[in-house]
Amino acid sequence: MALMHRSYGGKIFRPKPVIHEDERLLVLASCWGPGDQAQNLVDDVVKYVTAAMGDVEVTSHFEYLTCLSDQANYLRIATLLANENIFRGENKNEFVSGYELTVVLKQKNQLSWAQVGGPHILIRRNGQTLMPLTVHLDVSAEVSASNLLAPLPHWLLGLDSTCQIQCGDVRYQSQDQLVLAGSTYLSKSIFTESPSGPLSLEKITQWMIQENPESAFWLGLWPLID
């Protein structure tokens, strides 16, 4: 099944991601600034990961980490290459834009990810509440817990020669769902409600709007079916 996604405008702008999805790979890139490299960023990541997964010989000057799976290493190296391309290209002479990048790969009941910035990634199993895999504290939430401020990610790709990447793996079961939430806040209901059956995008949207009707967000729901 395909990724289902939607945006909610609220009162303050939040960029929508450029999306690539195929049967096993999901790539999201959001541009913060006037830059125009989000699609190229996605294309470069897809090209590298597809080649690596297809046993095509790919070379990189970045270290292969033995503490990670092969799949997580592919995603991590693709992210490092993407960061290098933006830092030495669009941002070579001055900072133009930073990018949030999320790469998720599913293969043989193993879910792998590499990420700089958001969105939050959560996994849901039938009858259980959502469990976070990655959660990000927005800078605006650090500055003020009560006033609605413009969103600003803690981590962005392309602003330095290196970048902080969150990556890992988890085993998933048939009928699990992956929830991606580009937002400053997460609804309390996400962690307390456990409706029977598959979770719908409409239900998550309702939870988010009820608690923070003025805060913009982007939501994605990806069924984890091989």
Please give the residue ranges for each predicted region.
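Conserved, helical-rich catalytic subdomain that frames metal- and/or nucleotide-binding sites
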Residues: 71-72, 131-180
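Helix-loop-helix
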Residues: 47-90, 192-214
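A residue-level signal for conserved active-site and pocket-lining positions in enzyme catalytic cores
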Residues: 82, 118, 183
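Conserved short alpha-helical segments that host acidic/polar catalytic motifs at enzyme active sites
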Residues: 79-81, 85-86, 111, 146, ...
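N-terminal entry segment of metal-dependent catalytic domains or homologous docking segments
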Residues: 1-58, 92-106, 110-111, 119-124, ...
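C-terminal catalytic subdomain
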Residues: 2-4, 162-226
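Short glycine- and acidic-rich boundary segments immediately preceding or forming the N-terminal edge
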Residues: 1-13, 81, 136-137, 142-144, ...
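Short, surface-exposed beta-strand-loop junctions and turns on beta-sheet-rich folds
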Residues: 118-121, 128-131, 139, 186-187
